Amino acid sequence: MPSYGSGKLKLRETPAMLGTEAEKDLLCPGTPLYHELGVALVEKQISVDFFLGAAQYADLPTISGLCDATGGQFFYYPSFHSEGPQAEALFGDIYHDLTRETGFEAVYRVRVPQGAKVSMFHGNFTLSNTDLMVLPVCHADTTVVLEFSIESVLSMPCFPIQGALLYTNSRGERRIRVHTLSIPISNILSHLFERVNQDVITAITLHQGMNRHLD
């Protein structure tokens, strides 16, 4: 845990907090400094990945703000040992991180038809303006979650969604990738359950529940 300079952090966890309502405060950042630093790094197109193997309290919710803002990833190995499965996992994660195909200086925007809008954005990125996601790096493991709200009756048979990603590849070429989806609209609830991705819905619901509890 940082112990010197402007980013110095104090031990927030105490035995008296455990099992009480105050314990949830430990899951929130103790200071906005690291998130603000991440936003400043985004302006320089810098991304941060953390590989942490601390055996003691390290205030992960606070320092992970660097990854959250810059499109980075956070890898945590509790009570890390230099031999055994954890060492193999660390090697595999670093190797994958350095060798996977990566895009740089990326911006991503999703468009929906009139009468609908993107109401919430979730993921590791910095939001510019109201709907432009800025990611210093992007790759196959990058995931974002968007929530849509319907503001008027849609008379169309399908709901079109278009995502456009502008990025620079590893050869220095500026590229744009566009994905367009046309999702059928139905008032029959069973159609929804037949086609829903249960793993994705479960993960999103868990994140939403955790965020609402912390708020």
Feature map (PLM): residue ranges:
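Extended acidic, low-complexity intrinsically disordered regions
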Residues: M1-D215
